Every structure is written in C-alpha cells, then in structure tokens.
C-alpha cells in the first residue's frame, strides 16, 4: 500500500504515467479525501478500511467525519419517508409560520441551527464555516433517530378520529315543533253549528277525530259570537304566529303531565230523539265544557252500556222534573 501511494504521489507531481504512453491519459479515479488533505493521492477503491488517517482528529479530518455522518442520517431519513409513503401513513408537513421559527446561533455564529417550536420535525442545516468538535458530531447522530421516532409517534396519533369534531355534525333540529323544515300552514280545528237547522246535528256529529301519536288535549268551548266552536289551548306555543282564532294548532303535549293519560275520545255518529227529549237540552248537555281536568275533549261513548244507562237515567229524570214544576205552577194558579 505504501508503494502504491508513493507512485501515485510521484505521478501527480511529475505528471508522468507509469505505463510510459504519453498519448493516453489514465481515467480519473476517486481519491481519498483524508489522504489528499495530508498530501497523498490514494485511490478510494479498496482504501476505506486501510486508510492511515481514518481515526485522525485534526481539523480537516473532523470536518470530513461530520459531513459523512450528516449524509448518512439524511439517507436514512429519506429511506424512512419512502417506506411511509409506500404504506400510506405519511401526512403533509405544515409550513411553519415566521413567528414560530427560532434561529439559534451556536459557537459565536460559527454554525446555524434551524429549530421549529410547534412542528414535530426538526431540520439541521449543514455548517458552512467555522470549526466544530467531534463531540458535536456524535451528538447529532444520537439526536436524529430520536427526532424521527418522535415524529413517527406524533404522526400516528393524528390518525385517531377526533370524537368532538364528528359529534358536531349531529345537531338538534332547527324547528322542534315541525316534522320537517317546511312551514306548512296549520290545519283548521274549528267546528260550526248552524242555528237555522233545528233537527240537523251534522255540525256536531261525524267521524271521531283521532291521532295515531297522541290525544288532543284541548277542549271545544263556544266563542263569544256563539256560532263557532274553536279549540282552546292550555299553553299557546305559537303566540308569535299571526293566525286567526279559528285557525289554531294543538300543542304537542298535554298541559297536565302529572296526571294519567286519558282514553281516546269517542264521539257518537248520530243522536236519536228517543234517548234525548228535546234538542235544546241535548245541545246544552253535549256542547257544555267538561268539568274534570283529566281530558280536554268531550268523551261520549255510545257503545259502552254504562254510558247508555246514564243517558237513559238523565232522560227519565228530566220529564219528572218538568211534570213536578207544571203541577206546582198549576196549583199556584188555582189558589189565586
């Protein structure tokens, strides 16, 4: 090895080739940088293990060692990024803001180190000028794998689903009193009783009004005019709507929530004069507001035997009271 180095150094100084052929030039071979710095020209092939200045601690050799370590770390980082891209777990690195950049000058301005406060990656710039010791180079080798492993852990933690973010998609409806977003006009809940037709009970009788979801909690009470029968709410949830008195929408829940749920209302389809003696008394008994607070709708079940017996008992008592009143008035007239 020593003879080869001496011959290469002589040919470099004299410019003569050992082959003696002046017309041909030998192909350019990579030379050892450490040997070149010490004044020797040694081919790099097969020379890495046997270099005399491999463990040299001089100024030039320490710079070469630091450069080799930085290049090896960069190659390892590129290889890891390529593997992450193949696996599909890489994510774009956000650009740092100018306020987050912190430039630290070390060793009296000899080398600059660029550090990011918020991001998980940290890039170190290669030293341009100045001198650094070998201990600094060893610290770089120890720090770079820890930085890459920390960045890998933080990148995997970002893949976890953020539950508060996805829970914001499920919000309560904007209009809780409507089934959908369309504001349909409320349907008519008024009943009119014609006073001209004496025997017609069509305004009162008819098919029962039932709801598949809930019972109507309001009562039919005569208005001030006396001809219209409107529904009266316990709590007016739509006070802001400018609707007339005969267009009222029922509330969703009963105002008496503590009491038991009433049975569905049963309205008779027709009324006969055999059970009820007079039309005026029937009108007064059917259309009077209820006294109990359990149900808001008048319930007259003609199918049950109890209701039939009660109506017959009322019908029997009313003629007796009329006959007693007639006898009292007749006796008073005879006395006069």
Swiss-Prot record:
GO molecular function terms listed in the Swiss-Prot or TrEMBL record: DNA-binding transcription factor activity, RNA polymerase II-specific; metal ion binding; RNA polymerase II cis-regulatory region sequence-specific DNA binding
Record InterPro entries: DM_DNA-bd, DM_DNA-bd_sf, DMRT, DMRT1-like
Domain of life assignment: Eukaryota
Polar residues biased stretches: 1-17, 288-311, 318-327
Keywords (A to Z) from UniProt: Activator, Developmental protein, Differentiation, DNA-binding, Metal-binding, Nucleus, Repressor, Sexual differentiation, Transcription, Transcription regulation, Zinc
DNA-binding region in chain numbering: 32-79
UniProt keyword annotation of Magnesium present: no
Compartment annotation: Nucleus
Region (Disordered): 1-28, 113-138, 285-336
Record's GO cellular component terms: nucleus
PROSITE patterns xrefs: DM_1, DM_2
GO BP, sorted A to Z: cell differentiation; regulation of transcription by RNA polymerase II; sex differentiation
Primary location group: nucleus
Known function: Transcription factor that plays a key role in male sex determination and differentiation by controlling testis development and germ cell proliferation. Acts both as a transcription repressor and activator.
Protein's name in the database: Doublesex- and mab-3-related transcription factor 1B
């Amino acid at each position: 090895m020593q003879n080869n180095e001496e011959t290469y150094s002589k040919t470099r100084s004299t410019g003569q080739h050992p082959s003696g052929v002046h017309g041909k030039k030998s192909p350019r071979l990579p030379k050892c940088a450490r040997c070149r710095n010490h004044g020797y020209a040694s081919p790099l092939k097969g020379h890495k293990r046997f270099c005399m200045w491999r463990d040299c601690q001089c100024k030039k050799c320490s710079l070469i060692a630091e450069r080799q370590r930085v290049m090896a770390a960069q190659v390892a980082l590129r290889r890891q990024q390529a593997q992450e891209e193949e696996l599909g777990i890489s994510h774009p690195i956000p650009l740092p803001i100018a306020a987050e950049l912190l430039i630290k000058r070390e060793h009296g301005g000899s080398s600059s180190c660029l550090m990011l406060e918020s991001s998980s990656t940290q890039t170190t710039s290669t030293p341009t000028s100045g001198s650094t010791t070998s201990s600094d180079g060893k610290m770089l080798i120890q720090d770079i794998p820890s930085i890459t492993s920390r960045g890998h852990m933080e990148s995997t933690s970002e893949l976890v689903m953020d539950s508060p973010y996805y829970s914001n998609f499920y919000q309560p409806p904007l209009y809780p009193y409507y089934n959908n977003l369309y504001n349909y006009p409320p349907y008519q809940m008024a009943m009119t009783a014609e006073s001209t037709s004496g025997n017609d009970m069509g305004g009162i009788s008819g098919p029962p009004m039932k709801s598949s979801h809930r019972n109507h909690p309001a009562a039919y009470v005569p208005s001030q005019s006396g001809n219209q029968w409107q529904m009266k709410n316990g709590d007016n949830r739509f006070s802001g709507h400018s609707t007339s008195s005969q267009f009222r929408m029922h509330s969703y829940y009963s105002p008496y929530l503590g009491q038991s749920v009433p049975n569905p209302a049963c309205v008779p389809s027709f009324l006969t004069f055999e059970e009820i003696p007079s039309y005026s008394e029937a009108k007064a008994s059917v259309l009077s507001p209820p006294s109990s607070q359990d149900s808001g709708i008048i319930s007259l079940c003609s199918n049950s035997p109890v209701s039939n017996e009660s109506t017959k008992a009322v019908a029997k008592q009313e003629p007796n009271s009329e006959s007693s009143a007639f006898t009292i008035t007749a006796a008073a007239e005879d006395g006069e």
